[in-house]
Design a protein with these regions (language model features):
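Extended, subdomain-level signal for the structured scaffold at the beginning of enzyme domains
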Residues: 1-91, 95, 104-107, 125, ...
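Beta-strand-turn-beta hairpins that frame and shape the catalytic cleft
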Residues: 138-143
Length: 180
């Protein structure tokens, strides 16, 4: 199960494209509404979360995903985010974040000494991460980071490959006519 954490102000592309890749691969997902049951994107679109933070049971967690955008500030100081990150660190689940959201992982020490990418606007918030400036997506151990909206499809395909293998990711690539 991939738990997708939604906050008001998330970047639309950074949430939709990776989830589309996961869906095409048949990977189950649950949307967790961090800032409420109804979440509003940067562009004003609303989605309904599947569960609230109080309903979250991580026992079947394979990966957590934090979409970025201007709403990234809404991840900080949220007990559900702290709990999910701690669970992933303890159980070695994957953690994926894109754009500004890798700064949330950095603030929790997850990226200390790890290679990572992020949106340039949060470079100074990346702590002891080893920033990879020429990459769209970076994988280091159980952490997957994407640099921004332009990396959304590639991040989603990388998530599929890590969870279900190269063949599953290639099938999705072919299905969307991806040439990257």
């Amino acid at each position: 199960m991939v738990y997708v954490f939604h906050v008001d102000g998330y970047e639309d592309t950074e949430m939709i494209a990776p989830l589309d890749m996961l869906s095409r691969a048949g990977i189950p997902m649950t949307r967790v509404g961090v800032t409420g049951k109804t979440i509003t994107s940067k562009m004003g679109f609303t989605i309904e979360a599947d569960i609230t933070p109080e309903e979250l049971d991580l026992s079947d967690c394979e990966m957590i995903f934090l979409p970025g955008g201007p709403g990234t500030k809404n991840y900080f100081d949220k007990p559900v985010i702290d709990r999910a990150i701690s669970y992933c660190m303890e159980h070695h689940c994957y953690m994926a974040a894109i754009c500004a959201a890798p700064s949330v992982l950095a603030a929790k020490g997850v990226l200390d000494g790890k290679k990572a990418v992020c949106h340039f606007s949060v470079n100074e918030k990346m702590g002891n991460a080893q920033l990879q400036e020429d990459a769209l997506v970076c994988v280091d151990d159980n952490v997957i980071t994407g640099c921004g909206a332009a990396a959304s499809i590639e991040l989603g395909l990388t998530m599929v490959e890590l969870l279900r293998g190269r063949e599953a990711a290639d099938k999705v690539r072919h299905g969307i006519a991806y040439c990257g």
